């Protein structure tokens, strides 16, 4: 439970456990992952059925770890988060966003021969799947030195699994509609899932 600021700081009160409906996304998980290290005690966060949001949770953990925060993965989708931690400032290079770049990549697949820069091939971003899906539709994808070039070819229908990358489903649906033949996008929804938080 989070209480209002007192003397410039937030006072957090511990509770045994609670559940959060995750059917509308992972925002609550992200907030908890950022807040729990500041508690006076240790916490355990468990996500049931992360489904189509797994990569977004892992990106959050990667970001707070870079700030000096320790997060211990006890088993699949369960993390122990020690308390009394402090965030530390650091310098870093921000990689390009595959979710936003997906629009440009799809434009390239539809006939505009587009090159998108500053997209790292080594990333936890699930939306990097846009490259795999465009190739499945028949587009030509070339990668070199953090540059991605997408060229049009004769697009055809395909079955595209949106597991772990639902944010790019809308732009892929539009692209597939302009391809020849039938396409099917699976696992586009966010199933009802719950987050369990335990504070000893």
Question: What kind of feature is each model-predicted range?
Answer:
Residues 1-197:
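Short, structured segments at the rim of ligand-binding sites
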